[in-house]
Regions:
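Conserved hydrolase catalytic core segment
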Residues: 104-143
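Conserved alpha/beta-hydrolase catalytic His-Asp/Glu region
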Residues: 160-214
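Conserved HGGG/HGGXW glycine-rich cap/lid loop of the alpha/beta-hydrolase fold
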Residues: 23-78
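Alpha/beta-hydrolase fold catalytic core
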Residues: 1-39, 61-62, 103-104, 280, ...
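Short beta-to-alpha linker loops that shape the active-site pocket of alpha/beta-hydrolase fold enzymes
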Residues: 69-73, 138, 268-271
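Conserved serine/cysteine hydrolase catalytic core
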Residues: 196-257
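Catalytic histidine-centered segment of alpha/beta-hydrolase-like enzymes
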Residues: 270-279
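Active-site loop/oxyanion-hole signature of alpha/beta-hydrolase fold enzymes
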Residues: 20, 53-57, 67-109
Length: 292
């Protein structure tokens, strides 16, 4: 399933910027033609900029692509106060990175939490948004999906080898990702874990779990319909994993009703959130980006 990225135009450059409160933030920067609107990729809750490597390689044929590690994830600095792993603080970080990198307009590709940030930007800085891709996220989130995520974030055992890591990925995500094969789960594991001197760990601060512990999943979760409606005049593509337990088909239908020009794409055999590693998904996103 994984996309061939052998045609990499350039390897990404790691850049570091300072958040408003002084924390170090990491950004991957794929150089590309400067005459096109750049793409900024925002990952999921416990994910990193590296998730977008295959997609960014493809998009960098026609434009610059940036991917951000939120604080406490990837190569960004961990925060001593877990309460700062919040949408509000992260959104301020994103705006600071935009300013530092001289980006005044971009297409946002947001996976899960990254899509929430895209919707928030429609309220906090709408002029930044040229187009938006929402990867398995919408204004309404299913509680059962959040319950599943809360069941593993910050709780994964440390694998002993890459083969063990792939098995753990399959155990954790196999039901959601019924269309993946052994090589796909190994690729996913390598994006989830890091290995230093034989010791494996996740690529995020385990304190992220604390941000989920207080969620009342017995009641409907707060929605973001007003923020989504801020995208009404902005070209928007929503991607849904066919097996997703976080973004329902009914929510996508309602999104289309409120955003008449919304484009939708379903990834078969994948759940929350589609990995954007397969050629059809990558080319669908590329067609949207390059068409806007």
């Amino acid at each position: 399933m994984t996309h061939d990225i052998s045609e990499t135009p350039t390897a990404p450059v790691s850049r570091y910027y300072t958040a408003p409160d002084g924390l170090k933030l990491h950004v991957l920067d794929w150089s590309g033609p400067s005459d096109a609107i750049p793409v900024v990729c925002l990952p999921g809750l416990a994910r990193t900029a590296a998730d977008f490597s295959a997609l960014a390689t493809r998009l960098a044929r026609t434009r610059r692509v940036l991917a951000l590690d939120y604080r406490g994830r990837g190569l960004s600095q961990w925060d001593a106060d877990w309460k700062n792993y919040s949408l509000a603080v992260e959104n301020a970080d994103i705006l600071a990175v935009f300013t530092a990198m001289g980006v005044d307009r971009a297409t946002i590709v947001g996976t899960s939490r990254g899509g929430l940030h895209a919707m928030l930007l429609s309220a906090t800085r709408p002029t930044l948004l040229h187009a938006v891709v929402l990867n398995d996220i919408g204004p309404a989130i299913e509680a059962r999906g959040m319950a599943r995520i809360r069941g593993y974030v910050g709780k994964l055992p440390a694998p002993k080898s890459w083969a063990d890591a792939a098995d753990l990925a399959r155990f954790t995500m196999g039901e959601q990702f019924s269309g993946l094969d052994a090589a796909d789960f190994e690729a996913y594991a390598r994006l989830t874990f890091e290995e230093k001197k034989g010791v494996f760990s996740t690529r995020y601060d385990p304190a992220l779990l604390k941000t989920l512990e207080g969620l009342d999943l017995s009641a409907p979760l707060p929605t973001m319909w007003p923020q989504f409606e801020g995208l009404r005049d902005i070209p928007t593509l929503v991607i849904r994993g066919a097996n997703s337990d976080l973004l329902s088909a009914e929510t996508v239908d309602e999104m289309a009703r409120r955003h008449p020009s919304l484009e939708a794409y379903v990834v078969p055999g994948q759940g929350h959130a589609p990995l954007l590693l397969d050629t059809p998904s990558i080319e669908r996103v590329a067609a949207f980006v390059e068409g806007n």
